[in-house]
Amino acid sequence: MTLPDVASGRFTQEKGFHIVLQVPETHVQIVIDAILDVAVLKQGDYDSVAFKTNTGLQQFRSLGTGRNPKSPGLINVPCLEVSFFLENEPAMITQVIEAIYDAHPYEEPVIRIQEALRTKHIPSVDEDNPNRIWNARDADWYKPDG
């Protein structure tokens, strides 16, 4: 896939990979912590940047050809999807996937890796924008120090 070249006076672009994985609800933070042990997940002036969905149901049936016995029917497990961006550094991507395999409770975790393009703001371009957190009333989720 060829990614477009996009940029403006407000943002630049960075090519890398979008990683999406499904994790049982009980193991989400364990897996995220394992990822953060090997990758900072940086986005501009922020680190530990990841997205977690609400709980959904992952379904599967074991064929009995792996470590687990054959399932008599479908199994449904409450799971979340976790997604994040990784820079185009093959060694780092390998370390992150290995960390997921080490921390994930499944024999075969569902992991999707897709070439991606992300934008990064150019600092000081719109400091006076009234929609920025620092220029508006505090959002209930944003509490600056001090």
Predicted regions mapped to residue ranges:
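Hydrophobic structural segments
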Residues: 1-146
